[in-house]
UniProtKB/Swiss-Prot annotation:
Tissue distribution: Essentially present in young tissues. Expressed in roots, cotyledons, leaves, and shoot and root apical meristems.
Membrane topology of this protein: Single-pass membrane protein
InterPro entries named among the record's database cross-references: Plipid/glycerol_acylTrfase, Tafazzin
A Pfam family that the UniProt record links to this protein: Acyltransferase
Physiological role: Acyltransferase that catalyzes the N-acylation of phosphatidylethanolamine to form N-acylphosphatidylethanolamine (N-acyl-PE) (e.g. NAPEs containing C16:0, C16:1, C18:0, and C18:1). Also mediates the formation of acylphosphatidylglycerol (acyl-PG) from lysoglycerophospholipid by O-acylation. Uses acyl-CoA as acyl donors. Acylates 1-acyllysophosphatidylethanolamine (1-acyllyso-PE) and 1-acyllysophosphatidylglycerol (1-acyllyso-PG) at the sn-2-position.
Transmembrane segments: 21-37
Name listed for the protein in its UniProt record: N-acylphosphatidylethanolamine synthase
Keyword RNA-binding: no
Length: 284
């Protein structure tokens, strides 16, 4: 599917009133679920708060996390104290599944004004709406992604990541700050197999929700690009009906084979950071 209500995502849409209304309402809901209906705790919250509020101008922020439930976003932000989820200008942009969040015009409008970018699962890393996500990074905004690509509620190591987040890092003119976050307990609040394989109609109460913020992941993108280009020279390009566009990153031109090497390297580093943080979260 092409662009969905992109006009509703603009900050000047109807003077910003719909965005302010939706974000304030969703934030109130998230805080109620996280702090009134459940008990929540956040570890290393200041790292995220400082990056959201006072990172260098023009530098984008990407937060990456595991995906435990359909309510991870926005409830995980409701666990933070202060204005993290209440300020419409500072609030995150988030990649959201088109088949869940954009099923009809009403849902589409609400999620669009709430700073959600529709993504077609299985649509590839160069689908049309990924360009909008890239534009948000070019604007220096904060973008949240779930690089696992779907909800996983088992307490197992972080699975192989999809390449969408890696492609955004590589394509961004300014290398984003990438911050890993792990959360636990959300699978109990919104279990996938609650009632004959269905989710509960409302979040379940009296659960302990835990959010653990890591430290920014260090990426030497120019070195990773150089390595990807060198490694790709010894690999036969894959046969595909639709070729990826040529990418220029860190001053080098990458064909599809080189891009695959780069995206694998970036994704593996994010996956490793998330897994390290997941193990830490289990001990806290």
């Amino acid at each position: 599917m092409g662009k969905i209500m992109e006009w509703a995502a603009r900050s000047d849409h109807l003077g910003g009133i719909p965005r302010n209304t939706v974000i304030m309402a969703v934030s109130a809901f998230a805080k109620a679920v996280a702090n009134l209906c459940n008990k929540s705790s956040v570890h290393n919250a200041d790292t995220l708060m400082n990056l959201v509020q006072s990172r260098p101008p023009g530098v984008p922020l990407i937060t990456v996390s595991n995906h435990m439930s359909t309510l991870d976003d926005p409830v995980m932000w409701g666990a933070f104290k202060g204005l993290l989820s209440l300020d419409p200008e500072l609030a995150r942009w988030v990649l959201a599944a088109e088949d869940i969040c954009f099923r009809n015009p009403i849902f589409s409008y609400i999620f669009r004004t709430g700073k959600c970018i529709p993504i077609t699962r299985g649509g590839g890393i160069y689908q049309e709406n990924m360009n909008e996500a890239l534009q948000r990074l070019k604007d220096g905004s904060w973008l949240h992604t779930f690089p696992e690509g779907k909800v996983f509620q088992d307490d197992v190591p972080i699975r192989r990541l999809k390449w969408g987040t890696a492609s955004l890092i590589a394509r961004s003119p300014v290398t984003p700050i990438v911050l890993p976050i792990i959360h636990r307990g959300f699978e109990e609040m919104m279990p996938e197999n609650y009632n004959n394989g269905r989710r509960p109609l409302v979040p379940l109460p009296n659960k302990h929700l835990k959010v653990v913020v890591g430290e920014p992941i260090e990426f030497d993108v120019p070195m990773m690009v150089e390595t990807a280009v060198l490694d790709s020279r010894h690999v036969t390009p894959p046969l595909q009906e639709v070729k990826w566009p040529v990418l220029t990153s860190a001053g080098q031109v990458l064909d599809e084979t080189a891009q695959r090497h780069l995206y694998i390297a970036l994704s593996e580093k994010i996956q490793s950071s998330l897994e390290t943080l997941r193990l830490l979260a289990k001990r806290l």
